[in-house]
């Protein structure tokens, strides 16, 4: 049985004003947002509080370092301070990258934790992805996330294999970056993926990210043609 897709719109404004404007637009479209505060030109825990006060839907707080494909240039200690503030303020999810997961410890955890792996160069073989998954399990996250550059059919197969073979009690996000990866972004939430990400008003945070309206139209058409016809054999 196919799952109902959960779509999360990414917010990436550079100034606080632009960020809040994007957040408002995103919240009129979906019930789930990812707040990429590493895109802000300046950031401090007080801004995290202001953003939280304007957040009315389920939200993932993400402060991704430049080394992991994000924009944040601060230290892991600064990341910890920002994410801890997000936890204390009541954000639903915190996204922590696997390379820094052993350096960031959230105290009195309230938020759900997403452990992420990003590879902007290629999709590793399934054996390597499974090894990374075992490393992620050491942190006992609520959600596992894999996003890799997908340039050919074999990359798509590898990511689908990772998703389909996950444990039944595990939540996993699997994304392909690039043109070939778009099919994974569309189909993974139908096949057991926890959610998929989309953009709004052209604010794209990753290669191959699909506009929310385009994604919504796809799912509407998909369910229309896949629904069983009553009264017919």
Curated annotation (Swiss-Prot):
Entries under HAMAP family matching the protein: AroD
GO biological process: 3,4-dihydroxybenzoate biosynthetic process; amino acid biosynthetic process; aromatic amino acid family biosynthetic process; chorismate biosynthetic process
Reaction(s) the record says it catalyses: 3-dehydroquinate = 3-dehydroshikimate + H2O
Descriptive protein name: 3-dehydroquinate dehydratase
Keyword RNA-binding tagged: no
Enzyme class: lyase
Cited InterPro entries: Aldolase_TIM (IPR013785), DHquinase_I (IPR001381), Type-I_3-dehydroquinase (IPR050146)
The protein's role, per its UniProt record: Involved in the third step of the chorismate pathway, which leads to the biosynthesis of aromatic amino acids. Catalyzes the cis-dehydration of 3-dehydroquinate (DHQ) and introduces the first double bond of the aromatic ring to yield 3-dehydroshikimate.
CDD domains reported in the protein's UniProt record: DHQase_I (cd00502)
Active-site annotation: 118 (proton donor/acceptor), 145 (schiff-base intermediate with substrate)
Pfam families: DHquinase_I (PF01487)
Organism the protein comes from: Coxiella burnetii (strain RSA 493 / Nine Mile phase I)
Enzyme Commission number(s) of this protein: 4.2.1.10
């Amino acid at each position: 049985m196919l799952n109902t897709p959960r779509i999360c719109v990414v917010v990436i404004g550079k100034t606080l004003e632009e960020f809040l404007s994007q957040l408002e637009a995103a919240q009129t479209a979906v019930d789930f947002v990812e707040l990429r505060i590493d895109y802000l030109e300046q950031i401090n825990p007080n801004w995290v509080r202001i953003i939280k006060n304007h957040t009315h839907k389920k939200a993932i707080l993400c402060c991704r370092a430049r080394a992991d494909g994000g924009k944040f240039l601060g230290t892991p200690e600064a990341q910890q301070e920002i994410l801890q503030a997000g936890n204390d303020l009541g954000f639903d999810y915190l996204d922590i990258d696997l390379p820094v997961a052993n350096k960031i410890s959230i105290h009195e955890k309230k938020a759900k934790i997403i452990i992420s792996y990003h590879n902007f160069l290629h999709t590793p073989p399934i054996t390597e992805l499974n090894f990374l998954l075992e490393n992620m399990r050491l942190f006992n996250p609520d959600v596992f996330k894999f996003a890799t550059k997908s340039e050919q059919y074999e990359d798509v197969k590898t990511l689908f294999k990772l998703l389909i073979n996950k444990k039944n009690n595990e939540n996993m996000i699997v994304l392909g970056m690039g043109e070939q990866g778009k099919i994974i972004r569309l189909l993974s939430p139908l096949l057991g993926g926890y959610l998929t990400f989309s953009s709004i008003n052209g604010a794209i945070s990753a290669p191959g990210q699909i506009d929310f309206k385009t994604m919504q139209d796809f799912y509407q058409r998909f369910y229309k043609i896949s629904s069983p016809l009553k009264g017919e054999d």
